[in-house]
Curated annotation (Swiss-Prot):
Pfam families noted in UniProt: Adenine_deam_C, Amidohydro_1
Gene of this entry: ade
The family this protein is said to belong to: Belongs to the metallo-dependent hydrolases superfamily. Adenine deaminase family.
Cofactor names: Mn(2+)
Any one biological process term the GO annotation gives: adenine catabolic process
Sorted UniProt keywords: Hydrolase, Manganese
MF terms in GO: adenine deaminase activity
Protein name (Swiss-Prot/TrEMBL): Adenine deaminase
InterPro entries linked: Adenine_deam (IPR006679), Adenine_deam_C (IPR026912), Amidohydro-rel (IPR006680), Metal-dep_hydrolase_composite (IPR011059), Metal_Hydrolase (IPR032466)
Reactions mediated catalytically: adenine + H2O + H(+) = hypoxanthine + NH4(+)
Domain of life, source organism: Bacteria
Length: 570
């Protein structure tokens, strides 16, 4: 129980604090100073900086102590591991708070998916807050596993762990005043909750209208000019450094003393190998400092700025009364984590976790999510009225695409992969309602010359997507995905040669992040070296985004090939 009298006595040095970090270099995010001294902690609260004695004392030998890092916007599902395993990985990188949008699992499992994520993240040495997914489904051009309306979200909106409404991707719906979109915005407003934005290239009067609807943040800026305009409008900007979308090196050049307090960091979508190799928020801080940002400012963007944006009281700074969420760093250049303290407890030290992540939650309601009609080679037959057709041309080292016209070779009006070198067939198979809906299209530049690959990670509705150079291997891959209940797989010469099961909603594995990263890396190597995939293509990431019908120019869903520019099926 909090006793103010006793805390004051300990702050005065009359009584010993429970924990004192001795000989620290303390990063003060308020004054931009590095302060030498002892840091006194009692329970979960910082009680003072100065000269203190404690029941437990740790000599830090001039190491740096910073506020624990905050990820202001993340989709855990993109790590392909369970929330507990994700927590284990990012705690070791100095992260003590994350703000999660469970958008991916919500598109598969609806409210059951959100509830699973909330249950799974209880009682961990990591604070996990939620933004309720605002766009389920993301569009009407694909079949999702759920539809969430304002009435559905009302069940959880007043939870202490729910900070507001997740990224409002449907900015056209905001501007056109769609009833259901406005209902969700009104719901968040009625509970005084925050609304996250998703508004790439939205500027001028449209941005004014978007902000007027109550939207406070954005993580989609691609230029300094766009970032500054949104800051002028009162928005907080989360600079994103994900696996596919990386904006830090561009945007950080526009950060200065005038705008820095409105800027945060976020991972958004970050894959397991990137977290293990490069890090999490520590990577953002490190890259910011490398790009010339003053070290206390970089740490401020990874801590107090996000805390203030999301109304997290007593979080994000090292000062009396603030929560003792701390990261001990070897230096302020490499930002190497030595120790992590969460709520006054040492939870990670010398590359070892000192507190477990708790027992795993029941996955019954978020497993066995592949529900399809039997798929045969006949189902994947592509009949064309003409030998000139639209093809999805994938870009190298990017998730962007071009809509190109190509002449193809047909056999009795049917596309045959063996007659069209350099062009792969792609199909999206609805996996939620057993509708039998299948969209089929063609892809160039992917480079796959043998076999097929398939996945249940296919943004945003996460149907099965399969790409190959022959129908037999494509069907084999789809059947394997159904057999394991979701995941990613490779087939070749009529045989399955590698599979990673993603038993949680077809999106996440219960295995360790190290296991998942190693398996994904192995499968990528097989794609490049055995199947012939272009080495400038990340096969499974590129495959996953081929199904997202909101990114220009051309995509594929279970309903067909979609022209994003002209907003129509081809």
């Amino acid at each position: 129980m909090y006793c103010i009298e006793e805390k004051i006595e300990k702050a005065l040095g009359i009584k010993e604090a429970s924990l004192v970090l001795k000989n620290c270099n303390i990063v003060n995010v308020f004054s931009s100073e590095i302060i030498r001294g002892d840091l006194a902690i009692d329970g979960d609260t910082i009680i003072g900086i100065g000269k203190y004695k404690g029941k437990t004392e740790i000599d830090l030998s001039n190491k740096y102590v910073a506020p624990g890092f905050i990820d202001s916007h993340v989709h855990i599902e993109s790590s392909m591991v369970s929330p507990k395993e994700f927590a284990r990985a990012v705690i070791s990188r100095g992260t003590t708070t994350i703000i999660v949008d469970p958008h991916e699992i919500a598109n598969v499992c609806g409210m059951d998916g959100i509830k699973y994520m909330m249950e799974e993240t209880k009682n961990m040495p990591l604070d996990v807050f939620f933004m309720l997914s605002s766009c389920v489904p993301a569009t009407s051009f694909e079949t999702s596993g759920a539809v969430l309306k304002a009435e559905d979200l009302k069940e959880l909106i007043d939870s202490d762990r729910v900070l507001g409404l997740g990224e409002m991707m449907n900015y056209p719906g905001v501007l056109s005043r769609e009833e259901e979109v406005l209902n969700k915005l009104k719901l968040a407003g009625s509970y005084n909750k925050i609304v996250d934005g998703h508004a790439p290239s939205v500027r001028g009067n449209e941005l004014n209208a978007y902000n007027l609807a109550g939207i406070k943040t954005d993580h989609e800026c691609s230029s300094i000019e766009e970032m500054n305009e949104k800051i002028r409008n009162g928005m907080y900007i989360a600079i994103r450094e994900g696996s596919a979308a990386k904006n830090l090196d561009i945007l950080i050049k526009g950060v200065n003393a005038k705008n820095e307090r409105r800027i945060m960091f976020c991972a958004d979508d970050r894959h397991p190998d990137d977290i293990l190799k490069s890090g999490h928020m520590d990577n953002c801080v490190r890259r910011a400092i490398y790009n010339g940002i003053e070290n206390t400012a970089a740490i401020r963007m990874a801590s107090i700025n996000a805390a203030e944006c999301y109304k997290l009281e007593r979080v994000g700074a090292i000062a009396p009364s603030y929560k003792a969420d701390l990261v001990v760093l070897e230096d302020l250049k490499d930002v190497k984590v030595n120790m992590v303290i969460k709520s006054g407890e040492v939870v990670f030290k010398d590359n070892k976790h000192l507190k477990d992540m708790g027992s795993k939650s029941d996955i019954t309601k978020v497993s066995n999510t592949v529900n399809i009609k039997k798929v045969s080679e006949e189902n994947l037959e592509l009949k064309l009225d003409t030998d000139v057709c639209s093809i999805i041309s994938v870009a190298l080292n990017s998730i962007s695409t071009k809509n190109v016209k190509r002449k193809v070779n047909l056999s009795n009006g049917i596309f045959k992969c063996e007659l069209n070198y350099g062009i792969n067939k792609v199909a999206v198979i609805e996996r939620h309602k057993k509708s039998g809906s299948i969209g089929i299209g063609l892809v160039e530049n992917f480079g796959l010359k043998r076999g097929a690959i398939a996945s249940t990670v296919a943004h945003d509705s996460h149907n099965i997507i399969v790409l190959g150079n022959n129908d037999e291997d494509m069907v084999k891959a789809v059947n394997e995905i159904e057999r394991v209940g979701g995941g990613i797989t490779i087939s070749l010469d009529g045989k399955i040669i590698e599979t990673l099961e993603l038993e949680i909603a077809g999106l996440m594995s219960n295995k360790s992040m190290e296991f998942v990263a190693e398996r994904v890396s192995k499968m990528i190597n097989i794609c490049h070296n055995t199947l012939g995939v272009n080495k400038d293509i990340q096969p499974f990431m590129t495959l996953a985004f081929l199904a997202l019908p909101v990114i220009p120019e051309i995509r594929i869903t279970d309903k067909g090939v979609f022209d994003v520019v002209n907003f129509k099926f081809l």
